From Swiss-Prot:
This is Nitronate monooxygenase. One of its GO terms (biological process) is response to toxic substance. The keyword Transmembrane does not apply. Binds 1 FMN per subunit. InterPro entries: Aldolase_TIM (IPR013785), NMO (IPR004136). It catalyses: 3 propionate 3-nitronate + 3 O2 + H2O = 3 3-oxopropanoate + 2 nitrate + nitrite + H2O2 + 3 H(+). FMN binds at residues 74, 181, 186, 223, 242-245. At physiological pH, 3-nitropropionate (3-NPA) exists in equilibrium with its conjugate base, propionate-3-nitronate (P3N).
């Protein structure tokens, strides 16, 4: 096995100038955000896992109208949900008092609100027609036939991995680069099997392991908020860093005032894992919903993404009464370093900090 030296160069492969990738962040990223990052020399991304095929086509075209640079479209490759009426009703009963607190009633029945890319031929058809430069996968991988079709269309492919075993699957599938998602990352863990043991490797350890053991270029992700973090990732053997939380407070995102206020305030100092909001483990700033899930009396949530149907309904009920504490306030462990800047300014600042960090490290080279 080799280190990153001698591997295919990632930046020209993706058509970018800077080793800075804005994480896709379904529900947060917008065409304006992705295009601004692209136009500043990084790789902008859009998460379409929460959209149908028509919605994905729309945002791809909107982004193309704002930039002629390559951008990344991300999909969810989770196992399609298996409904369990008993578990779902128990979960709704647990949430009912919180709905009542805000003058609402829980849904009578929950729905599977997100179609997995594994079972979405319409989304594949959109990609083959629109041909975004890059498509990335989270929660797993599509079939070999789907990967072959995307590659035949000239689309570059990325996939998240949280351990060496998943990285080996990514490599064997013919994907172009691996996103090494450390435990520090905000949002959903990208594990392929949520029921399997999770090594919970940190970004430093995972990036170094994959850089040494894998033939593919590695992109470090998780807890990276500034140029110093990017420099550290590059020193560990990554060819780029993917930043999510760092971009959440950018002016181009779609977050509401409660999420923005939390990220730029004291709430950003504490993040926690919860499955209560969506039915799948994700890192969020601690809030009323994460506390609800941490209650020892809490039953098992409905499965992902069925539980998200209830989570979104409760958040909407609370927001209607001016309470923002039930949102999916996804954030990484270093969220307290977030800055509210236009995306282009943030990319420029990250590049300056990266160069400063590299220069500071030169003193140790003598």
């Amino acid at each position: 096995m080799t280190d990153q030296t001698g591997k295919r160069a990632l930046l020209p492969l993706l058509g970018i100038d800077k080793p800075i990738i804005q994480a896709p962040m379904a529900g947060v990223s917008t065409p304006a955000l992705a295009a601004a990052v692209c136009n500043a020399g990084g790789l902008g991304s859009l998460g379409v896992g929460a959209m149908n095929a028509d919605g994905a086509r729309k945002v791809i075209r909107e982004t193309r109208a704002l930039t002629d640079k390559p951008f990344n479209i991300n999909v969810f490759c989770h196992r399609p949900a298996q409904a369990d009426a008993a578990v779902e009703q128990q979960w709704l009963s647990w949430l009912a008092p919180h709905f009542e607190k805000y003058g609402a009633t829980p849904p009578a029945k929950l729905s599977d609100i997100y179609t997995s890319f594994l079972a979405d031929p319409a989304m594949l058809a959109v990609f083959l027609e629109e041909k975004p430069a890059i498509v990335s996968f989270h929660f797993g991988l599509p079939s070999a036939d789907v990967i072959a079709e995307l590659k035949k269309a000239g689309i570059r492919l990325l996939a998240s991995a949280t351990n060496l075993q998943e990285a080996a699957q990514v490599e064997a599938a013919g994907v172009d680069a691996i996103v090494a998602q450390g435990i520090e990352a905000g949002g959903h863990r990208g594990v392929f099997d949520p029921d399997a043991f999770d090594d919970r490797l940190g970004t430093f350890a995972l990036t170094r392991l994959l850089a040494k053991e894998c033939r593919l270029p590695v992109i470090a992700a998780g807890g990276i908020m500034d140029g110093a973090g990017i420099a550290a990732a590059l020193a560990l053997g990554a060819q780029a860093a993917q930043l999510g939380t760092a971009f959440v407070a950018c002016t181009e995102t779609s977050i509401d005032e409660g999420y923005r206020r939390a990220l730029l305030g004291e709430a950003a100092r504490r993040t926690t894992f919860t499955a209560a909001i969506s039915g799948r483990l994700a890192r969020s700033m601690a809030n009323s919903f994460t506390a609800l899930g941490a209650d020892p009396r809490s039953p098992e949530p409905a499965t992902y993404p069925i539980a998200y149907d209830a989570g979104k309904a409760l958040n909407a009920a609370a927001k209607a009464k001016g309470e923002f504490g039930y949102g999916a306030h996804w954030a990484g462990q270093a969220a307290a370093l977030a800055r509210s800047l236009p995306a282009a300014e943030l990319v420029a600042q990250l590049e300056r900090e990266l160069k400063q960090s590299i220069e500071q490290l030169r003193q140790f080279a003598n």
